[in-house]
Amino acid sequence: MLDPILLRKDLQTVVDRLQSRGVSFDTERFNDLESRRKLVQTETEALQARRNALAKQIGQLKAKGEDASAVMAESQALPGQLKQLEESLAMLQQQLNELLMSVPNLPHASVPVGASSDDNVEVRRWLPAEAGADGNPAPLGFAPRDHVAIGEPLGLDFDTAAKLSGARFSFMRGQMARLHRALAQFMLDLQTGEHGYTECYTPYIVNSSTLYGTGQLPKFKDDMFFVTKGGGDDDPKVDEQGKPLAREDQYLISTSEITLTSVVRDTIVPGDVLPLRMTAHTPCFRSEAGSGGRDTRGMIRQHQFDKVEMVQVANPEQSYDALEQMVGHAEEVLRRLGLPYRVMLLCTGDMGFGAAKTYDLEVWLPAQNTWREISSVSNCESFQARRMQARFRADAKSKPEFVHTLNGSGLAVGRALVAVLENYQQEDGSVRIPEALRPYMGGIEQLKA
């Protein structure tokens, strides 16, 4: 959520920065709600001051033995008036929050202005061998097959997945399933053993409050899988009168960014423990509501996929150093696997909802003769923290400040599997195992039918 103080002080700057993302801000509604909020708040504060003054006056009159009945009568009328004003103020504040909950983050000054992925900027690329004439990885020396054609003889089974679950799911068996697991284990070991992340195991189902905090709700509700619970409620909530309350909605996670980042929700952490570095390997569930007919073949865009996520909770003064560090942590996975990649700085129009600055890592897929995203690393600054009320205290005497939250894929396991299959394919249909993965594969050097 955007800083309300910034909106009140410099609304036009906020509007201009949002326009660079292709987003219009409803200034008329904001100004209307804000002016009404100020008016009610002024009236509330005046009534509170009057209540305090009357209480003092009553005390003075009683101390002198004088009649305080008239003042007490006025004082007794105030609670009802004050309650109405406080309810009006709470309603207006809720409407303001609802407006701001659907507004994306402001782009950092270093983010290039643009409308789409065509305006993203390549920062660097890494190739394990000499480039071809066009600057991309050199051709394999034979007609490359895509990961579906390579994988099906080796244990990648889309027909069984479709029978079990429908389109956009995968079923793996044997060596293919082991290679998929090996990739995830390798990524976790690298992030925890060398990059200082703490491995976490998180729930795959979260409540709506958690999703509001990280920004998936309310804007991206259609992208989530809603969970319908059967049977009775094993943890019924009741109000002050003992009446049952409605159960909070629950959803499958679309990324473990949600659960890892939310560890600090409604928390004030000591400044000396920052940065917090967390990682988790989880399945991710996405409805792909807006994907249309894109990437219907294979594993590129699925309803369920695995990902090793990296999250850092940082001091605002160090968050952009942390962003560059996290990009390097994702890059190291690709380097160790020997996969060609490039780093792209996303433009304002291509960034995610909560991001202030994002780098995408794109891996080379020979069969498509193109680069495809395999990791996205973002600094959300205080955007999520403000929604979650996640703060830190620099020292015992300091006021709490909002932390900065960062997240990134380290990496998407399924897409890494695709990249390994396509880049390490051999003309005879076998696939060489990258050296970094061989310890996880029992020393196997290649997959073959």
Swiss-Prot record:
Keyword Membrane attached: no
Keywords (A to Z) from UniProt: Aminoacyl-tRNA synthetase, ATP-binding, Cytoplasm, Ligase, Nucleotide-binding, Protein biosynthesis
EC number in record: 6.1.1.11
Binding site for L-serine: T255, S256, E257, E309, S409
Pathway, per record: Aminoacyl-tRNA biosynthesis; selenocysteinyl-tRNA(Sec) biosynthesis; L-seryl-tRNA(Sec) from L-serine and tRNA(Sec): step 1/1
GO biological process: selenocysteine biosynthetic process; seryl-tRNA aminoacylation
Pfam families: Seryl_tRNA_N, tRNA-synt_2b
Gene Ontology terms: cellular component: cytoplasm
MF terms (GO), sorted A to Z: ATP binding; serine-tRNA ligase activity
Subcellular location: Cytoplasm
Catalytic activity line of the entry: tRNA(Ser) + L-serine + ATP = L-seryl-tRNA(Ser) + AMP + diphosphate + H(+); tRNA(Sec) + L-serine + ATP = L-seryl-tRNA(Sec) + AMP + diphosphate + H(+)
Binding site for ATP: R286, S287, E288, E373, I374, S375, S376
InterPro entries: aa-tRNA-synt_IIb (IPR002314), aa-tRNA-synth_II (IPR006195), aa-tRNA-synth_II/BPL/LPL (IPR045864), Ser-tRNA-ligase_type_1 (IPR002317), Ser-tRNA-synth_1_N (IPR015866), SerRS_1_N_sf (IPR042103), SerRS_core (IPR033729), tRNA-bd_arm (IPR010978)
Domain comment as written in the entry: Consists of two distinct domains, a catalytic core and a N-terminal extension that is involved in tRNA binding.
Function: Catalyzes the attachment of serine to tRNA(Ser). Is also able to aminoacylate tRNA(Sec) with serine, to form the misacylated tRNA L-seryl-tRNA(Sec), which will be further converted into selenocysteinyl-tRNA(Sec).
Subunit structure: Homodimer. The tRNA molecule binds across the dimer.
The family this protein is said to belong to: Belongs to the class-II aminoacyl-tRNA synthetase family. Type-1 seryl-tRNA synthetase subfamily.
HAMAP family: Ser_tRNA_synth_type1
UniProt protein name: Serine--tRNA ligase
Name of the gene: serS
